[in-house]
Amino acid sequence: MANIKSAKKRIKVIETKTLRNKMLKSSLKTTIKNFLTVVEGKNVEEAKAAYKTAARALDMSVSKGIVHKNKAARTKSRLAAKLNALNA
């Protein structure tokens, strides 16, 4: 356990940020799963809206430092491929 006052504060701050990051990561995964279930339902219009939501969530998580930009780009690419396969 830390003895220095600033170290104790850092521990509290890190716990808070960890909880926030877990919450945001969880909601991101839920958004992606929602898109995948809509794609399974083969509804093109709903899938487009769900893709837009998922892509926006990925971009937001990159800007907040929760997901690496390359991982977000790769995930968006895979989701877009599924959307395009649904359109074809």
From Swiss-Prot:
Signal peptide: none annotated. The keyword Kinase does not apply. InterPro entries: Ribosomal_bS20, Ribosomal_bS20_sf. GO terms for biological process: translation. Keywords: Ribonucleoprotein, Ribosomal protein, RNA-binding, rRNA-binding. HAMAP family: Ribosomal_bS20. This is Small ribosomal subunit protein bS20. It comes from Clostridium botulinum (strain Hall / ATCC 3502 / NCTC 13319 / Type A).
